Amino acid sequence: MKIILTGLHEDADIDKLRERMSQFGPVLDIQAVRDGDPDKPWFIVNLNVDMAHATDVARRIDGIYYIDRFLHARVMFNG
């Protein structure tokens, strides 16, 4: 399942993000989307987990204050 993360800094380290997200399950891929406002990229994290687990992960991450910003996480139901 894919989780959309917003709120990370523009210079977020994909390898560090992969490492941190791997605590929730196997990370298949991470795509950085920098179109639009380059200061506010968003990331699509593809985890090898079912929808229920992905929803739990998104709920745990959503609203965390990380490096001067609040993170937001949503499960991507299509795609």
Where do the protein language model's features map onto the residues?
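Glycine-rich beta-strand-turn "strand-cap" elements at beta-sheet edges
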Residues: 76-79
